[in-house]
Structures are given as C-alpha cells and as structure tokens.
Amino acid sequence: MRVVVATGNAGKVREIAEALSELGWQLEGLNGLTLPEETGTTYEENAALKACAAALAKGLPALADDSGLEVAALDGQPGVYSARFGNRPNDTERNLYLLEKLRGVQDRRAKFVSVVMLAYPDGHVETYRGELTGTLLEGPRGENGFGYDPLFVPDGETRTLAEMTVAEKRTISHRGRALAALLATHRNGPPPRETVRTE
C-alpha cells in the first residue's frame, strides 16, 4: 500500500518507515504539498488536519501525528502548543522557558503524548495514541533527540531521552507506542473500520 507521510520532517519520515517496515508499505513524503496550519485544540484535531488534507490532495492514505509535552504543575501545558511554547524560536529557548516556569516547583511530573492518524481519501480515519510518563529535570542532559528530550527522564529510567540512542528511544517513546499500535492493527491486513487504539 502506498501511504503519504504528512510531515515536512525527513527524519520523522525515516522514523515512521523504520517502525512500520514489516508492513511493506511504500511511504512517500509530501513532495511539495503544503499542509494546513495546526489550528486544533487537541492532538487528534491537529493530526486530522494534516492527515485528511494530505489524503484528499494525494488520493492516497496519509499518516500524520501530533504530539506534545504535558506538565502536571502547569495544568497540562504546553500540550498541543509544545512546538510554539512561549513563542520561543527553537528547542533550546523553549527548554529554558519551561525551566523558568518550573523554577522552585517540586512536582516535576510530565508526560509526552502522541496521536498518530491514518486517513483515507474516502474520509475514513484510524487513530492511535501513545503516552510516556516521566519527570522533568532542573537542567538539560544529553545530546541526542530533540525538543524537550534533554529534560525528560521516563519512569523507570535514569537517563533522559536525549541520553538514549535513537533505537532505545523508539522502543519506549510516545510516538513509538502509537506506531506499535498501528503496526499491531495492520499486521494481518487492513482492520475493520472505526479503529482507535491506545498503547
């Protein structure tokens, strides 16, 4: 099956391709297609905006995800606004802004959430959700990964996501869990309609 990956991030296309390799799908990028702005207030809405637009424009199934970091002490912020948190221009600045917001805060619990959506040109969608709980440090550690990875230690681990290899991170990450649910659903062929899975 040919599937469009609705992202401009080549690294994300590779990550998805590796996670779903056993399905034998032919994954392709956007090839110049511009996606709509993420205006949703939930991960599901933002993933749907991208996946449905790509599926309609390309006439093929399309896969998109939206993800974010939810911090308990900040009432779930930054959430769907994680990539734009504090209007900071890059990951380093967003991490510094988050640390400032958490200065003196004892409750450092947080979770990463990812919603992966597979949309078809006929309007059918499948939704898969993955979560990873953990704790935020008071300063960054590690050089791998991106986003808030240098601050986030998953429950049961001593290293941040940025201190793990890509392969290690993929096995436990929120996106990895959502993609694993999609893989499990499609392993034996297309699933029944109205599929929603959570791992």
From Swiss-Prot:
Main enzyme class: hydrolase
EC numbers: 3.6.1.66
GO molecular function, one term: ribonucleoside triphosphate phosphatase activity
Database matches in Gene3D superfamilies: 3.90.950.10
A biological process from GO: nucleotide metabolic process
SUPFAM superfamilies tied to this protein: ITPase-like
A cellular component annotation (GO) from this entry: cytosol
Sequence similarity: Belongs to the HAM1 NTPase family.
Function: Pyrophosphatase that catalyzes the hydrolysis of nucleoside triphosphates to their monophosphate derivatives, with a high preference for the non-canonical purine nucleotides XTP (xanthosine triphosphate), dITP (deoxyinosine triphosphate) and ITP. Seems to function as a house-cleaning enzyme that removes non-canonical purine nucleotides from the nucleotide pool, thus preventing their incorporation into DNA/RNA and avoiding chromosomal lesions.
UniProt protein name: dITP/XTP pyrophosphatase
Source organism of this protein record: Deinococcus geothermalis (strain DSM 11300 / CIP 105573 / AG-3a)
